[in-house]
Amino acid sequence: MNRLTADDLRQLQTHAPAAPACRCGVGACDGWVSLSPERWPAAQMQAIGTLRDMAVHEPSFEELHPHGTRYESPAAPVAPHFYPYNRCTLYRCADCQRLLLRYTEAGGYYVDERVRELAPGLPVLGDRPL
């Protein structure tokens, strides 16, 4: 799968529609939301690429919030080298053209799919780790 950079994400954002109505069932996801596999419309999702560095066996769990945001905040920036973005695949909905970041949250006793829209205007931080 194609590895995406911060510049790639910004370029894709410039062509993404702003909050379109969609029948895909994903719903609003301006911050990270839990989405069961049954609700993920796999048939209409097109994988665009990954943010994961396949050369790194275990990506970092360190988060980056330079403006005091938190993981679940809709204003939290996309930081490709930091958690959870360093584990994400980017998809495009074939119906509404929305861009969606998705990763698997794996805890001790559960597995949870998380989704967040890569909306136009969402800050995307640089490609170099700080």
Label the model's feature ranges:
Residues C29-W32, S36, L100-Y103:
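Cys/His-rich zinc-coordinating "finger/knuckle" motifs
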Residues A76-L130:
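Short, compact, well-ordered microdomains
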Residues A21-V26, C93-C96:
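Short cysteine-rich clusters marking metal-coordination/redox-active sites
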Residues M1-A6, T50-V78, V124-L125:
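Short, charged low-complexity linear segments at domain edges
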Residues H15-P20, N86-T89:
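Short metal-coordination and nucleic-acid-contact micro-motifs, chiefly zinc-binding Cys/His arrays
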Residues T5-H15, A76-P84:
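Short, intrinsically disordered, charge-biased short linear motifs at domain edges
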Residues P37-T50, A106-E117:
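Short cysteine/histidine-rich metal-coordination sites, predominantly Zn2+-binding motifs
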